[in-house]
Amino acid sequence: MKPILPDYSQSGVLVVGDVMLDRYWYGPTGRISPEAPVPVVKVENNEERPGGAANVAMNIASLGGHAHIVGLTGKDEPAEVLKNTLGALKVKCDFVELDDYPTITKLRVMSRGQQLIRLDFEDKFENTDPELVLSRMEQALPNVRSVILSDYAKGALEHVQSFIQKARAANVPVFIDPKGADFERYRGATLLTPNMAEFELVAGKVKSEDEMIEKGLALIEEFDFEALLVTRSEHGMTLLRKGVEPFHLPTQAKEVYDVTGAGDTVISVLAASVAAGKPLDEACALANAAAGVVVGKLGTSTLSTIELAEAIHGSQDTDYGVISEAALVEAVKRARAKGEKVVMTNGCFDILHAGHVSYMNHAAELGDRLIVAVNTDESVKRLKGPGRPVNPTDRRMAVLAGLGAVDWVVPFSEDTPQRLISEVLPSILVKGGDYKPEEIAGGAEVIAAGGEVKVLNFEDGCSTTEIIKAIKGGRG
């Protein structure tokens, strides 16, 4: 299965769980300490990254999704670092800051690619008032399409059953990265993502794939889950659902450097993909591809839609299909770095017909990459009037993404794509019809940047308006 990337900018995901800050100190080792038989590290640089549930939220943001995070922290400097780092990625931080606890922080000392020691600064959050989190969840739920509960057994999910019930009552699916052998506490969740060790801790040792499937389905029945996604390291992943054939995905990892944060990536891509409208099996395929990318990186890592598209389609088909605006800008930068000429056009494309296909083919011939910017439903309605569009945005974009001439499809909500074109600045801007180049939205900006503006003729006899009239008249 090679799924087309969804438009992650349409996905809103609420992350609730154990928030952490990962710190890294890097430096060479050249001698043993005279004080004790340990290496001396000369620290030359350092790095700070969101970890745990914060890494999950960062993964969603890196895809262009809208992440809202609720978690427990202290009133301290690490909490401020997390808020600033996540805020810069447009993650909405809603932390419960407690006086008597430190923000969970893990410091790793690294030398020559090896971790020498890890220092943990933490106290488990215990006996906290569940309303502190529930009230924040209640405010966030109307604005999200999925919920992730990220459990590292640090206390933020002490009242996890209340959180599950709150989300399910709002008809929002709940995805959980579990911790420990007690799956009873996760009863009623939509899907759990245990790794093989976590699975066997609950179900017992398995000797074959058939036995794993049998035990997994039994867990689904016992704890009222809708599904389990068992991550199996070099054996890939297996999606188990009641009444549906098991769906197995082989691993896509080429090299494994570090599995830190891989589970965070799996659940973030899975939940964001479902929130963006993907069915569960396609969302799992995207999560599997994402895991194959991040295990090839050091430490807690995120990935971009460009990297995810390359993992699915190969480097020659980078970011094929529907893409967010932020990811498109990055994809265009990469295309330019390769010396590729980028062509851009736009329109409503409500009912795709032969004239559109011919137009796309001609536009694609002008360069190496073709972007199609598509008016959202609200924009089409303002431009075309009541009754339009006939097809909603996601379907129009999916059809365009299926054309061989088209590389990227991106939505825009304004009446014209002038702002979007100014951000992208294609090598060639193309419009169909009898426009003059100076009349085309975004044309002045493209020309000022050294690009070209071209007008292409539409094929005679092809018109969306005429097709709609023919359908209403019962002809054709």
Swiss-Prot record:
Transmembrane segments: none annotated. ATP binds at N195, M196, A197, E198. InterPro entries: Bifunc_HldE, Carboh/pur_kinase_PfkB_CS, Cyt_trans-like, PfkB_dom, RfaE_dom_I, RfaE_dom_II, Ribokinase-like, Rossmann-like_a/b/a_fold. GO terms for cellular component: cytosol. One of its GO terms (molecular function) is heptose-1-phosphate adenylyltransferase activity. Homodimer. Keywords: ATP-binding, Carbohydrate metabolism, Kinase, Multifunctional enzyme, Nucleotide-binding, Nucleotidyltransferase, Transferase. GO terms for biological process: ADP-L-glycero-beta-D-manno-heptose biosynthetic process. Residues 1-318 are annotated as: Ribokinase. The lineage of its organism: Bacteria, Pseudomonadati, Pseudomonadota, Gammaproteobacteria, Vibrionales. This is Bifunctional protein HldE. Its EC number is 2.7.1.167, 2.7.7.70. It catalyses: D-glycero-beta-D-manno-heptose 7-phosphate + ATP = D-glycero-beta-D-manno-heptose 1,7-bisphosphate + ADP + H(+); D-glycero-beta-D-manno-heptose 1-phosphate + ATP + H(+) = ADP-D-glycero-beta-D-manno-heptose + diphosphate. The active site is at D264. In the N-terminal section; belongs to the carbohydrate kinase PfkB family. In the C-terminal section; belongs to the cytidylyltransferase family. Pathway: Nucleotide-sugar biosynthesis; ADP-L-glycero-beta-D-manno-heptose biosynthesis; ADP-L-glycero-beta-D-manno-heptose from D-glycero-beta-D-manno-heptose 7-phosphate: step 1/4; Nucleotide-sugar biosynthesis; ADP-L-glycero-beta-D-manno-heptose biosynthesis; ADP-L-glycero-beta-D-manno-heptose from D-glycero-beta-D-manno-heptose 7-phosphate: step 3/4.
